[in-house]
A protein has these predicted regions:
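Basic-flanked hydrophobic alpha-helices used for secretion and membrane insertion
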Residues: 6-252
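A hydrophobic alpha-helix feature that marks transmembrane segments and, especially
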Residues: 2-3
Length: 252
């Protein structure tokens, strides 16, 4: 049993390395700007970095509402030589999306019977917001079926839209998103691939880089908060100026 367990760990470690699985996933409640991304990229220990957009939406499959997680594929250089192509996809059937309005679906035995290449998935926000606030189009043609190392089990996770549980996952081009800020960042750590993913040495190495990123994030957070305050103040002044202008117009 012990030998079998070690073999499974070794196989999964090789799989993670082959498909460049992230070592760190970085989240922010206010999103990430290009300046934030540069700060993370320049942090000691960071090897590869992929800034991405992610949202949860709802759709109907065979008349039943389902929650779908929408993630992104890099727009270019999807090669094994690109260290920034993290969580690489393996194509089971079809091809990767090349333009807005195309997507691939993560392989799932359950949904594979319901969604096929050529089908069109129509998305809505599942709440009071408009899906166009996040995506440039609400319809996506399935052009491929893929495996991803990002999800190694059938459970994708929970969501605050739909029924609360994510049913399946699609990937679209990064340019399909309308949002200005990135929602999450994946990073790999220098020297991590040479270590066993399950070893203390691996966790120590990744932990050191994680702490340095957190320090850099604190500095960037202060700058972001000030930027948001400045934007709010600018809008406030603009509104006041418009009110005064309207008052003057009425007096005339």
């Amino acid at each position: 049993v012990t030998a079998s367990s070690e073999d499974m760990k070794h196989s999964s470690d090789c799989y993670y390395d082959e498909y460049n699985l992230m070592d760190l996933r970085i989240l922010s409640g206010v999103g990430f700007t290009d300046e934030d991304i540069d700060a993370i990229r320049n942090t000691e220990g960071v090897e590869g970095l992929f800034a991405t957009h992610t949202i949860d939406a709802v759709t109907k499959i065979d008349g039943t509402q389902s929650t779908v997680r929408v993630m992104t594929v890099p727009d270019d250089n999807l090669t094994d030589d690109n260290k920034d192509y993290i969580n690489r996809l393996r194509i089971k059937e079809g091809r990767l999306p090349e333009k807005e309005g195309e997507c691939v679906i993560r392989y799932s035995e359950f949904y594979q019977e319901k969604i096929e290449i050529g089908d069109v998935i129509t998305l809505s926000s599942g709440n009071d917001s408009d899906i166009s606030d996040s995506l440039k189009t609400d319809e996506y043609e399935v052009v491929g079926i893929v495996y991803t190392p990002y999800y190694v089990s059938y459970d994708i996770g929970q969501s605050d839209v739909g029924n609360g549980s994510v049913g399946f996952c699609i990937m679209v081009t990064d340019s399909s998103f309308a949002r200005e800020y990135y929602t999450e960042v994946f990073a790999t750590v220098e020297g991590a691939k040479e270590l066993d993913t399950y070893s203390d040495e691996y966790f120590d190495l990744v932990g050191e880089t994680k702490e340095r990123i957190e320090d850099a994030a604190e500095e960037r957070l202060d700058a972001r908060v000030q930027s948001v305050k400045d934007d709010i103040e600018s809008e406030r002044r603009k509104t006041i100026d418009e009110i005064y202008e309207n008052v003057r117009t009425e007096v005339r």
